[in-house]
Amino acid sequence: MGVIKAVAVINGNNNVKGSLQFIQDSTGVTHVKGRITGLTPGLHGFHIHALGDTTNGCNSTGPHFNPLKKDHGAPFDTERHAGDLGNVVAGADGVAEVSVRDTQIPLSGQHSILGRAVVVHADQDDLGRTGHELSKTTGNAGARVRCGIIGLQASV
């Protein structure tokens, strides 16, 4: 398997915007890199959601991508949704530099994330570690601030 590339553009009617590149290497590891601006400083939940449907904004992107029907967790946990990518950190300037490597978000095969949404949340993802009622499903990460659809990128 060769290198596969995809992109997601994050934009909308608020100040949050950005661009993310997804690169799956020949070993099956996908690297997500890019920049998101306009965020409030601090940690923000960062997930792949099941659907690429934005007819109702980011609210129609469905739950976290979870083909193996597991509980929510941290990116390094065995028990986690495939789409659980943890948090991105926005500095005092509201900019988050994203760099995530993961084996559970392939760009090809049965559990491909192509056509699904990447979502940035308003609050910190608790990584399934608190007693909050939403901890094991959403990480209690709050509202969906902005999202983008992951689409195949031309290999030039």
From Swiss-Prot:
E.C. numbers: 1.15.1.1
Q: What is this protein called?
A: Superoxide dismutase [Cu-Zn] 2
Q: Which residues bind Cu cation?
A: 47, 49, 64, 121
This entry's comment on the bound cofactor is: Binds 1 copper ion per subunit.
State if Oxidoreductase is listed as a keyword.
yes
Q: Name one GO cellular component term.
A: cytoplasm
Query: Which Cys pairs are S-S linked?
Result: 58-147
Q: Which reaction does it catalyse?
A: 2 superoxide + 2 H(+) = H2O2 + O2
One of the entry's Gene Ontology molecular-function terms is: superoxide dismutase activity
Q: Which Pfam families match?
A: Sod_Cu (PF00080)
> For Zn(2+), which residues are the binding ones?
64, 72, 81, 84
Give the originating organism.
Answer: Mesembryanthemum crystallinum (Common ice plant)
Task: List UniProt keywords, sorted A-Z.
Answer: Antioxidant, Copper, Cytoplasm, Disulfide bond, Metal-binding, Oxidoreductase, Zinc
The family annotation for this protein states: Belongs to the Cu-Zn superoxide dismutase family.
PANTHER family named in the record: SUPEROXIDE DISMUTASE CU-ZN -RELATED (PTHR10003)
